[in-house]
UniProtKB/Swiss-Prot annotation:
Its EC number is 2.5.1.-. The lineage of its organism: Eukaryota, Fungi, Dikarya, Ascomycota, Pezizomycotina. Belongs to the ustYa family. InterPro entries: UstYa-like. This is Chlorinase cctP2. It comes from Talaromyces islandicus. GO terms for biological process: mycotoxin biosynthetic process. Pathway: Mycotoxin biosynthesis.
């Protein structure tokens, strides 16, 4: 009897174990089925987002490739690559269609006076510029020179030197000044490291490298407008072939050409009418550095200038 009972117990145990295994198997399958459905739902939801993200990345890459980010110059905030200008192998400043005299006149007409600017100390600090020589009509401003205008001035002097030599004349520009200008342009060229590739078109016997090739440039007119807004009232007077301005009795005469409506007009008028009034920014003994001949020339210049003012007002 005991053996039979034991056999029944074993069979019951086996049956229960089999049931449990089957139940676990069914439940495990149910869990796996639920997990698969959840994973499938997540994939279905994520797929559109992944596709949209992929498309946006492609569009962004294409935008960056096709259109460069906008960049601006340090001080005048000139936009890089703003205008398209074709390169010309020869212009009216150098071609054979104009006479030497006509081309010389064009070069001599270049006036870089506007490149002298007066910038307030606050603005120069914001721009990260070192403090400069004090502007004579406002102690809170310094005098700066646009480097673009400085370089342009050098090209004018180089023309004057080579033109005089070509004409068989002794150049009036000093060779030392020419060396300075050549070195200035050399430094500029190496600083900018222009990587534009000039193409070599087939022009027969004429090797006109880069002729007509389009270039992306800053707008010079916008630089001109920026410096004019900060005018130092400077003017080169009676400029010579040597690149020097003469005919002034005092250095301050060069800073008396303010644009109409300038707030410095009263100071300048007093400076002219009263015979060089010390504005407070000049050394007190500045006038004593002049020779008697220079003082006489200055007095004559003052008289003639004031006479002209009266004539204009009459």
């Amino acid at each position: 009897m005991e053996g039979k009972t034991s056999r029944y117990q074993d069979e019951a145990h086996d049956s229960a174990g089999s049931f449990n295994e089957e139940t676990e198997g069914l439940m495990s399958g149910l869990h796996r089925s639920t997990k698969k459905r959840k994973l499938s739902s997540i994939v279905k939801l994520a797929t559109p987002f992944l596709i949209v993200s992929f498309i946006l990345n492609i569009v962004q890459l294409a935008y960056i490739t096709v259109r460069r980010p906008e960049c601006y110059s340090l001080y005048a905030k000139l936009k890089e690559h703003e205008i398209t200008v074709p390169f010309r192998y020869a212009t009216e400043y150098s071609d054979d269609e104009h006479t030497h005299e006509e081309k010389d006149a064009l070069w001599n007409a270049i006036d870089i006076s506007e490149g002298f600017v007066a910038i307030s100390n606050d603005e120069s600090d914001r721009l990260g510029l070192p403090r400069s020589k004090t502007f004579p009509w406002d102690a809170n401003k310094g005098i700066y020179v646009s480097h673009g205008h400085h370089a342009l001035h050098c090209t004018v002097l180089l023309h004057a030197y080579t033109y005089d030599a070509h004409q068989g004349k002794k150049p009036l520009v000093s060779y030392h000044h020419i060396e300075h200008c050549l070195d200035l342009l050399r430094q500029d060229i190496m600083c900018y490291a222009n990587d534009v590739m000039d193409y070599t078109p087939d022009h027969g016997d004429n090797f006109l490298t880069g002729e007509g090739q389009q270039r992306k440039c800053r707008d010079w007119n916008k630089l001109s407008a920026w410096v004019k807004e900060r005018s130092a009232c400077y003017k080169t007077i009676n400029i010579t072939r040597a690149g020097e301005d003469h005919g002034v009795a005092h250095q301050l005469d060069r800073y008396t050409y303010c644009p109409p409506g300038s707030p410095y007009e009263p100071l300048i008028k007093a400076f002219k009418d009263l015979g060089r009034v010390n504005t407070g920014n000049l050394a007190a003994d500045g006038f004593h550095e002049l020779t008697p001949e220079e003082l006489a020339a200055e007095a004559q210049a003052v008289a003639e200038h004031n006479k002209q003012i009266l004539a204009d007002e009459g």
